[in-house]
């Protein structure tokens, strides 16, 4: 079983406008290095989820429950109900679509207003960095991420650029916050669940890279 040997389960969501490539990012990550580029998938209807087990540098093995949310306004009432049970959020925009970038603050505010900023690890993700028709600069995105107190990374599911790194960065940050007591287990909160106890996993001291992709 995928959860065998996993100490925790982390719920992580991808949020952003429709068409920014959230589903492609998730499928690329779950498929791993064996995955191949695929045609643009159909838009997500409501919420779908994937899972993957991950061995962290500190020695801890965790199960990731990865939630793919619809970006269309007609599904927002459905997806909002899931926000309070997320511990990690990738806020995704399309570097070739300025409007999707301008909506990031609204997506961020929706999560914060649901459960506050303390329980959630955020990462701003500029997707489709392989395309040469960008209308959002890396500098502008970095400035927005800094103003919201999160890291920034550029990715491309098509070229498999920084896809693993984006998810692994969020996961390691969650694990570190958990070990430091900044995130606490709560039986009424599904963001982090204890699957079985492990013998004192040491906290990771490795700093997370948040460099941009040279696509």
UniProtKB/Swiss-Prot annotation:
It is an enzyme of class 3 (hydrolase). NCBIfam families: small_GTP (TIGR00231). Mg(2+) binds at residues 23, 44, 68. It comes from the Eukaryota. Residues 196-215 are annotated as: Disordered. The keyword Nucleotide-binding applies. Switch I, switch II and the interswitch regions are characteristic of Rab GTPases and mediate the interactions with Rab downstream effectors. The switch regions undergo conformational changes upon nucleotide binding which drive interaction with specific sets of effector proteins, with most effectors only binding to GTP-bound Rab. Its cofactor is Mg(2+). It comes from Mus musculus (Mouse). It is a lipid-anchor. SMART domains: RAB, RAN, RAS, RHO. This is Ras-related protein Rab-42. One of its GO terms (molecular function) is GTPase activity.
């Amino acid at each position: 079983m995928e959860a065998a040997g996993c100490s925790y389960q982390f719920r992580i969501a991808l949020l952003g406008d429709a068409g920014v490539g959230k589903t492609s990012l998730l499928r690329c990550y779950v498929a791993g290095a064996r995955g191949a580029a695929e045609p643009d998938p159909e838009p997500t209807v409501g919420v779908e989820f994937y899972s993957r087990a991950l061995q962290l540098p500190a020695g801890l093995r965790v199960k990731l429950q990865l939630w793919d949310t619809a970006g269309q306004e007609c599904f927002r009432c459905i997806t909002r109900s899931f926000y309070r049970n997320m511990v990690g959020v990738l806020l995704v925009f399309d570097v070739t679509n300025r409007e999707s970038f301008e909506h990031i603050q609204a997506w961020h505010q929706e999560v914060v207003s649901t459960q506050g900023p303390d329980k959630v690890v955020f990462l701003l993700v500029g997707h489709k960095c392989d395309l040469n028709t960008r209308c959002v600069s890396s500098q502008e995105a970095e400035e927005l991420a800094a103003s919201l107190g999160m890291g920034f990374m550029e990715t491309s599911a098509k070229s498999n650029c920084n896809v693993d790194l984006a998810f692994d960065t969020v996961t390691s940050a969650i694990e570190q916050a958990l070990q430091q007591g900044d995130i606490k287990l709560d039986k009424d909160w599904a963001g982090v669940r204890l699957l079985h106890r492990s013998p004192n996993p040491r906290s990771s001291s490795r700093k997370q890279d948040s460099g941009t992709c040279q696509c």
